[in-house]
Each structure stands twice: as C-alpha cells, then as structure tokens.
C-alpha cells in the first residue's frame, strides 16, 4: 500500500462518519419540526364571516389546542384587528377563519404587508381561500381561491404527498366538500385529490391541491381545503395533525 492509499484507507471511516452525522442531523431537524411547540408565540386567531362554516367552532377548537401549546393568544371576531399594520407585526402567526365578508383596502393592504414582512398565516377551507373575493392582492398572497365544490358534500380521497409535514400521515377517505381551486403554480402542494366525472365530465381526472405551503416575502402561508364542518378535524385525526403541523411551520421562528 503506497502512502496515498494508506492515507485514503484511514480517511474513509472519517468520511463515512461525517455522512452519517449529516444524515442524523437531517432526521433530527425533521423530528424537531414536529416536536416544536408554539410556546410564548404571539398568535392571532381571527374568525367571522359566513356562519355556515361555523367559524367560532373552528376558532374554539384551535384556541383550545393553542392553549395546550402555551401560546400567547389574541382572539378577534371582526376585521378591525387588521386596521393597524404595526399591531399586526407583533404577531408570529395569524390563523384566520373568515368566509366571504368585506375587507377594506387598508385592512387588506396591512395584512398582506404584514405577511410579506414575516408574519405567518394559516387556515382551512373557505376561511382562508373564500375570503374577500374582490381583493386580488390577498388571493395572490394566499396562493389560491375557491371556485366550486362539485356535488356539494361527496366522498373522496385526500392523498398525502411526500413532505416533512405529511410524514407518517395516511391518505384520508373523507365525506365533505371537494374544493375546486384556482391556484398559483408557485405553491408547494403537499396533499391532493382527483376529481371524477360524476358531476362535470370535463373535470374527470383533474388533480387538485388539498393542502399547500408557500412563501410570501419573508412570511409563510399554510392552507388545507377540508373543514366545511370544523369537527372534521376531530373525526379525521390525520387532517388535524396536518393542520397543526401547518400552524407550526407557518409561524415565524
């Protein structure tokens, strides 16, 4: 064995150890993402709008969980909380459940600016993607807009895709509204569904996002489209896990 080969022989175990160490760090970092809590994070929960989506039930369920995380919670059942930009920047995460409703230009601008500058935003169903239909700057920030739910409530499958937020989660066979979306190609889709031809033959086989995450400036956005009845997240535990993981992911570090 020459000196070069002798040196390489002793170096190989070191290289292998480094590779294993990097791999271990990656695994631990992924696990830490799931074990992180929202302790001492400033969370704003905003609810209201169309009562058919039971926004208070959604807010109550979320607030109960946030308390278990020892988060600092501010609750608002109107959009006046969006009046002041400086106040919004004090929050680490905004969880919104407001379907339809009207938002002023100032309120929409403040919200979008706050997300752009690092505040996170997350939500479910129409509480995030069927809000403020006339405000395209809001839609641009969220990454999508509800446009239809063919057949109303139907049975369909939510397919979990390969992502750290979906690790260990199973596909969900669910009975609820299957949201048809207009969405930004820039979103990172982490769960999807496939439409059939039962109600509109021309959408047969269309693959549609059910959950996504995205960046907007310095802020992060998480969305999941199930939850017409907020208690679906209780009946389908993997849906709840994905929702709460999304909250943690979107929250400002």
Where are these regions (language model features)?
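Sec-dependent N-terminal signal peptides
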Residues: 19-28
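Catalytic beta-strand/loop cores that center a nucleophilic Ser/Cys/Thr
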Residues: 66-69, 90, 147-223
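Short, solvent-exposed loop/turn segments at secondary-structure junctions
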Residues: 50-51, 101, 128-129, 194-197, ...
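N-terminal secretory signal peptides that target proteins for export/translocation
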Residues: 1-16
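C-terminal segment of classical bacterial N-terminal signal peptides
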Residues: 28-34
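A glycine-rich, often tryptophan-bearing local segment used as a flexible ligand/cofactor-contacting loop or short
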Residues: 101-168
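Helical hinge/lid and interdomain linker segments adjacent to catalytic or ligand-binding clefts
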Residues: 42-46, 51-129
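Extracellular ligand-binding/catalytic regions of CAZymes and related secreted enzymes
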Residues: 37-45, 68, 202-208, 215-253
